[in-house]
Amino acid sequence: MDKQKAIAITTEIFELYTRYGSSDYIGEPVSQLEHMCQAAQMAAAEGADDEMVLAAFFHDIGHLCEFIMPLEKMEGIGIVDHESIGEEYLLSHGFSPRLGRLVQGHVPAKRYLTFKYPEYYQRLSQASKETLTIQGGVMQADEAAAFEADPLFADYIKMREWDDRAKLVNTPIPDLDFLKEMAIQHLMNQN
């Protein structure tokens, strides 16, 4: 992709964050923008590659898509299938299939972890517990086996870990320029 198109797409996507990111994050103690910035910062601090850092930042973009398209809501706790909506949105804008799959994979990772480690459920925020049922509930053994066999399995689990931890109050929002530049470079590297 050429640089001008990559800049235009990045500007469009980051405009979603600037315009709507300060909105309520489905009952969590932080805004959507704070949550997604924290997830990206955690990924970067742990040495994740650029696709993982961007996926951590974009993992809940499906919730922001409600402001640009009609979407089904989960009774005040977010957007139904936000993970798939986010994946489709990013793919349609030229992001890599791996990045899209990482965004999509953070919800199945929650379902998997509640299957594999029943105590994990107790660590979920109230909002995350409420959405779990709508998102398919605890995985069944056959689903879990297939999920474990996915080549991105370990990355999905990391994405979920950052998602769970990225709810710290009073954490300043960083300058988004480093993420914008990362997104532009990522898009320019796509065919």
What do these predicted regions represent?
Residues 1-191:
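Metal-dependent phosphohydrolase cores
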